[in-house]
């Protein structure tokens, strides 16, 4: 897991870049989330920032929905929403008890990690408006891949949201020179994807087509996480 100082740097940096991309064309369509305009995306992230700030401060329920921030309001408050989130994350000890909806440690560190990846993916989304999104930083993407399996797949199976499979997904992460093996949740026939950490994280989050990185094995397995 990325340490807290790096997490805060990443959240702040990606949060600012997201705003820059949206403000360059707030009415532009987010290619990776075509139902959203840039202004809609900014409003969504403002809602996430407000929700998590309140949760860390003990003012929100873990099962509450993100506040629905009107796009016109978010255009004015986003910078302050982001700054409050970063400050609250900085001031909250990683081992402080904070409720979480997932099968994960119920501590602030779990949310600090989630915020990094939320902002990284949505920064990438925002930059699709201009047509040339920069990759997610390798260290962030590697941890984002780990979080996907450790938190989302585990919770999805435990909650009955995704059917368990006797199958194994192998990720060959080219820029890191590593190979990650994930059972879903039982060992079975292997399906292999190969790509950079950023590309594979984005494929897991349905921002990139996983078939573009398919090497061998059951192509149908690549649809398995779409219900998570």
What do these predicted regions represent?
Residues 1-25:
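Non-cleavable N-terminal signal-anchor transmembrane helices
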Residues 168-198:
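Acidic/His-leaning functional-site neighborhoods
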Residues 55-111:
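Hydrophobic/aromatic-rich structural module bridging two neighboring secondary-structure elements via a short loop
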Residues 14, 18, 48, 78-81, ...:
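Alpha-helical packing segments of well-folded alpha/beta enzyme cores
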Residues 189-228:
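C-terminal interaction segments
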Residues 148-177:
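A mid-sequence, solvent-exposed acidic-amphipathic segment
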Residues 4-12, 35-42, 71-79, 109-112:
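Amphipathic, non-membrane alpha-helical segments in soluble helical-bundle scaffolds
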Residues 16, 24-64, 102-159, 200:
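Short, contiguous alpha-helical
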